Amino acid sequence: MIKNKKFLNIDEFYKAAIDCAIDVDPRGRKIVEKELKDIKKDYDSITDKKKKNMFDTDNLFNPYADTRILNIAEDKEIKKIFCGIDMQTAELILSDRLNEKNANIDLVITHHPNGYAYAKFYEVIGMQTDKNALNGVAINVAEALTNKRISAVEKSVSPSNHNRDSMAAKLLNLNYMCMHTVADNHVETFLTNLIKNKNPYKLSDILDLLNDLEEYKIAAKYNNPPKLFNGSEKNRAGKIVVDMTGGAAFDVAMIEALANSGVGTLVVMHLSDKHIDECKKYHINIVCAGHISSDSLGLNLLFKAIKEKTKKEFEIIPASGYIFVNR
């Protein structure tokens, strides 16, 4: 707990978010801390000054490459946060406009990675090795398929205009950060624990559990409820795996490995057509909880965790599709 202050500054908020995410990392804190120790060892072994200067030192304490402070215009106490799923240049201009109307926004947060965090967000995919191993996939298979996916995503994001929105934040003199996996960890672990405790028998039971949560209720009002992408409501769920964190969707070939490990149902935010076709091939049921609603649940749980851990308060102004629920 940070004492003697009513509010957090940006760095304190950032580090609290990371610590809260490690608390609920599906791999477990021990594996994450070992990863950080290995990164520190690699950093200490670098003798080339140029390479050392290029090293992102946030990696020494932050295992989530898709979560970063993108711009600090003014290091101030964070009382009011303007947060959304995709807070890009348009939303940054909106933030500036709202401040002209005395909104007093101290920090803009985008959930999906942006800036230099987006340029290397594929590094987060590495956590899928341990995640899928814990779900019963042989470690050598999980590692090989995860490395294949990392390589593919790295190539796909390489040509993007990564710093477009970060530069806009700088020009508008706005504090700006992205929080991706730190939020996604929360929704995956929360739903995993919910399903473990309730032990749903059929797919209809899983849908009922999701539809009882406020974020999914609100999404349903906007015609985007949890849905079945494979299987019927009467299907028995079998072994259920919630897959909602790890940067991006796993490699399509991982579906065969999950089927071989006995997985009967996947609960996901979203899946590509190729993933869905592969699930059909191996008779894996798919419960699609919803992308933006699941992202929103993760953010809501994260903000709750930060407040509980730090004993500090902050106000949220939701935008860009973010379904804010004060949990």
Model feature map: region roles:
Residues 1-327:
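Active-site catalytic microenvironments in core metabolic enzymes, especially phosphate/sugar-handling
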